[in-house]
Amino acid sequence: MASYPCHQHASAFDQAARSRGHSNRRTALRPRRQQEATEVRLEQKMPTLLRVYIDGPHGMGKTTTTQLLVALGSRDDIVYVPEPMTYWQVLGASETIANIYTTQHRLDQGEISAGDAAVVMTSAQITMGMPYAVTDAVLAPHIGGEAGSSHAPPPALTLIFDRHPIAALLCYPAARYLMGSMTPQAVLAFVALIPPTLPGTNIVLGALPEDRHIDRLAKRQRPGERLDLAMLAAIRRVYGLLANTVRYLQGGGSWREDWGQLSGTAVPPQGAEPQSNAGPRPHIGDTLFTLFRAPELLAPNGDLYNVFAWALDVLAKRLRPMHVFILDYDQSPAGCRDALLQLTSGMVQTHVTTPGSIPTICDLARTFAREMGEAN
């Protein structure tokens, strides 16, 4: 092959330029890395925060357990962020919970179509999710890196949340899809809106035998609720799949690589109680991903349309970093409280980002509770 001097000179010039560019970039990166290292050292000197999200199917005893735990601490070191009942019932819309249950009942009785029910359910679920999503966004600037859990000193502040945003933006929409009152497209639209998972996100899911769960749910009184056993079975199934999905992802599972292992479009059978991270990695068929092998989401060649595949990528990205714990609710309220307290010792704290973050977070949590915590 012929060799051309001009090309040789150009090549030599390019090599010199690249070498000089790499050198300049290395020089430029040094101050940046030094600054980042300094910021990390400063952050590590900041107070720590423990955030605990008590989640899972309704009616297990989450709120009672949480309130008993909060009562153990002082007002200054543990703050409870309750369900935003006032927003659901008054501020965001009128009687949202009753509207949801009535709509499902009318669909089950054949009084309205699935399409009509889906319109109402999707709108109502937006109302249910808004307070969680916006609170997460306001809190995010104050959350620094994870401080670890082993041998960590007590946090300066513990925040106990009655549910994480995924309850309203993933789990309940997915359960309504199983109930026939929401489309899979709408569920993935909610998935796309799940906020990025903050460091130190500790989520407590619950385990309770179904018969005991039914008994507890029948005895409680919540505004607008109906005893819907089919919905209870659906939401229990979804939370079981959620726990499996986190284990699957943290165990190295990739939904894109394993998608071909799903066959047909059948909804998975009801599974066992949520399990901790112990044990083998679940099969993709025992995760939330199996719900989305639905005809409405598939292209003619049988693959997911890209827009829906991207939503599943978001789902994987949001769930993978979560720290999931399982609380056994099949015991007395005091026993549940003590078991939850024991779980917190293994949870992951985070540093806050500024010296004023702790009082700011306290004010945020108390404002939320005061404005939205109780229905008027």
From Swiss-Prot:
Effect of A17V: In strain: Isolate clinical CH/1
EC code(s) of this entry: 2.7.1.21
InterPro entries: Herpes_TK, P-loop_NTPase
Binding site for ATP: G56, P57, H58, G59, M60, G61, K62, T63, R216
Effect of substituting V191L: In strain: Isolate clinical h3
Mutagenesis / variant outcome for changing L364P: In strain: Isolate clinical BR/2
Protein name: Thymidine kinase
